[in-house]
Design a protein with these regions (language model features):
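Single conserved hydrophobic/aromatic residue that forms the stacking wall/gate
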Residues: 2-13
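Membrane-anchoring hydrophobic helices of lipid-metabolizing enzymes
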Residues: 15-47
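Aromatic- and Gly/Pro-rich donor/ligand-binding loops
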Residues: 36, 50-71
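A short, charged/proline- and glycine-enriched loop
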Residues: 49-55, 168-174
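Conserved beta-strand elements of the Class I
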Residues: 56-57, 175, 246-249
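Cofactor-cradling patches in redox/metallo enzymes
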Residues: 61-151, 181-279
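Catalytic cores of enzyme domains
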Residues: 152-155, 161, 172-185
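Short, surface-exposed amphipathic charged segments that create phosphate/polyanion-binding patches used
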Residues: 161-172, 217-223
Length: 279
């Protein structure tokens, strides 16, 4: 699509029917101009001001679909006494990767430039995200000199080690699903496990770390049907439930939603179980 577009043939792939996926992805570019109260209308009772601070939080479009994760992160920041600037509440919507994968390179670059300017404007030195996809893109595709990019599992563990976030160790049995983008994509395996171990008992599934199965969902997945995705999610959930854990934990909004479709059990983001054990 990118090559066709650069040669003035951008409509070739749209001649047979309407490309709804491309239209949907491009809407992320225009979402920067959507009033905050409309984009965040489902955050009942949350402070929607963007705030200030050297730490910035970027939820991203996937995490916006799991508002409990965002709510939990807000409580983590509050408990640690962290002053935070909320990027998404000032127009930062998407890291740009979905647009890039769809061949909409110009729109992706526009989105990346916008986000970069937003980060520089606020002078943040640490950027925290709950989305492994955003994490990888910010680290590899953005020029963010002087800004440390952290996944929220890394950030939460750092707060715990620094004595800024105090949690209690309970008897709840947890199991953890390694997100593809966080584990195989960014090599982050130990931090989420250390956080879980601080609040309860961790039970590992049969396939874990580098060998952990994909949840079945992807921002660029067009190869399998929705029904097939659900079947994969059920298989993954079944393996996790076989550990005897009471709660399935993951650290990716896409994985959380996908696995949730495959089980009637409890599926939580890492930040949620931390908040439940803050002392």
């Amino acid at each position: 699509r990118d090559v066709l577009g650069s040669r003035g043939l951008g409509d070739v792939y749209k001649r047979q029917d309407i490309d709804l996926n491309t239209l949907r992805l491009n809407s992320r570019d225009t979402m920067r101009n959507v009033p905050d109260e409309k984009r965040y209308g489902y955050f009942k009772g949350l402070d929607r001001s963007s705030g200030e601070g050297q730490v910035g939080y970027f939820a991203g479009c996937m995490t916006l679909l799991t508002p409990r994760t965002i709510s939990a992160m807000e409580k983590v920041f509050q408990a640690a006494g962290e002053e935070v600037w909320w990027a998404d509440r000032e127009g930062g919507v998407c890291c740009g990767r979905p647009l890039k994968l769809a061949g909409e390179t110009d729109s992706a670059r526009k989105m990346m430039r916008y986000n970069t300017e937003l980060f520089r404007k606020h002078g943040i030195t640490t950027l925290v995200t709950s989305c492994p996809i955003c994490l990888k893109v910010f680290r590899e595709d953005y020029a963010l000199e002087g800004v440390e990019v952290l996944h929220h599992s890394e950030y939460i563990l750092r707060l715990m080690k620094a004595g800024r976030l105090h949690v209690g160790h309970g008897s709840t049995r947890y199991t953890y699903h390694d997100p593809c983008e966080l584990g195989r994509g960014s090599g982050i395996y130990d931090d989420p496990r250390a956080v879980i171990g601080a609040v309860g008992e961790l039970l590992e599934p049969a396939e874990t770390r580098e060998n952990a199965p994909c949840c079945g969902s992807s921002v660029a997945n067009t190869a399998i049907s929705d029904g097939q995705q659900v079947q994969i999610a059920k298989s993954v959930a079944g393996q996790l439930e076989a550990t005897g854990a009471e709660v399935i934990v993951t650290a990716c909004p896409l994985c959380k939603k996908a696995i949730g479709r495959g089980t009637k059990g409890e599926v939580r983001d890492l930040a949620e179980i931390v908040v439940a054990n803050i002392r």
